[in-house]
Design a protein with these regions (language model features):
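Conserved N-terminal phosphate-binding loop of PLP-dependent enzymes in the Aspartate aminotransferase
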Residues: 1-151
Length: 151
């Protein structure tokens, strides 16, 4: 009980709730701006600092064929490759939603800095740009998919 009351005291004293609302809106605005050029991004949404980036099937025929190959292996394959690249290349831990494999969750702590949020925006922009423009993203991921099928 004391720990809970102490936590509530810190949340109130440091105004972490209102701060999360303000930073979250800024964060999603920056995400929308950074990801707007990419057709595979359907929507950026959220509340407070909890945000989601929803992806969609690519319109480009070459990318769509690769995406469909992923989807046949497992519906979560595309999202998991995004998660893998964010962690491996950017040292950022994120995950896909359990009820919609096309949504990447961003759930930074309430004490996150604006600079850290900007780092996330740049990191996800780089990974999405790679997925949208580079065959390397897809060929490496298809290799992963083949290994997953053989397990």
């Amino acid at each position: 009980m004391r720990a809970g009351l102490a936590t509530l005291d810190v949340l109130e004293r440091k105004a972490l709730g209102p701060r999360a609302l303000q930073l979250g809106e800024q964060f999603r605005g920056k995400l929308r701006q950074a990801l707007a050029p990419f057709e595979i991004v359907k929507e950026v949404r959220g509340l407070g600092l909890l945000s989601g980036i929803e992806f969609t099937v690519p319109k480009k025929l070459s990318l769509r064929a690769l995406y469909e190959a992923f989807h046949r292996v497992h519906p979560a394959m595309f999202g998991q490759v995004i998660v893998m690249r964010m962690f491996r290349e950017e040292n950022i831990l994120t995950q896909i939603c359990g009820n919609n494999f096309m949504v990447l969750k961003a759930a930074p702590p309430l004490v996150v800095t604006e600079a850290q949020l900007d780092e996330f925006v740049e990191a996800i922009r780089g990974v999405v740009e790679l997925a949208d423009t580079s065959v390397t993203f897809w060929t490496e991921a298809l290799g992963l998919a083949k290994r997953a099928v053989n397990i």
